[in-house]
Regions:
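A short aromatic-anchored loop/beta-hairpin motif
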Residues: 1-115, 120-176
Length: 176
């Protein structure tokens, strides 16, 4: 991958069709805003929440990708759903509404979640071509990796699921 924005990225593909694909980077922290600040910017009242403000500061935001970085996307456990929720698998769903952020702030949201600003997108056939060129390694969707693995361990855990020793990887690939 020659785009430095995706170097060492673990991306969860949320949707894929003949028209293209959409995914979220799940291992890059968003350092320029904290969750309480995001709530304030969006005018989401969390003053009467059951989650202490100090705990809200610990909710990590992620850089989901370079597209529409002003939009929020919440990848979450399937125990929570709204009318607009996209069910991805039996255990993982995606919601992009203010209501879910409010629910999370009030301690009434999904059991597990990952909040991302922006997303990664591919046009028709683009992702498939990048995979053929060995730009990406793929694994099955894994809720444990998405929600329960520490940020700095996600890449090595993804490699381990493939049986790959990261130190043995080369940036030069080819096909035989």
């Amino acid at each position: 991958m020659t785009d430095p924005r995706f170097e060492n990225s673990v991306i969860f593909i949320c949707s894929h069709s003949a028209e293209g694909a959409m995914g979220l980077v799940i291992n890059t922290p968003c350092e320029n805003i904290a969750f309480p600040e995001l709530l304030d910017q969006l005018n989401i009242d969390y003053g009467h929440n059951i989650t202490p403000k100090a705990q809200l500061k610990n909710i990590q935001l992620h850089e989901g990708g370079p597209v529409e970085t002003g939009r929020g996307f919440i990848l979450h456990s399937a125990d929570y759903a709204q009318e607009t929720t996209l069910i991805i698998s039996e255990t993982i769903a995606l919601t992009a509404t203010l209501d879910i952020l409010s629910a999370i702030a009030c301690g009434k949201g999904p059991l597990y979640y990952l909040i991302a600003l922006g997303f990664s997108g591919w046009g028709r056939g683009q992702l498939e071509n990048e995979i053929v060129r060995n730009s990406w390694l793929t694994i099955e969707a894994d809720a444990e990796l998405v929600f329960k693995t520490d940020l700095e361990l996600k890449l090595s855990r993804a490699h381990a699921k493939l049986g790959i020793n990261f130190s043995m990887l080369s940036s030069q690939f080819g096909n035989a």
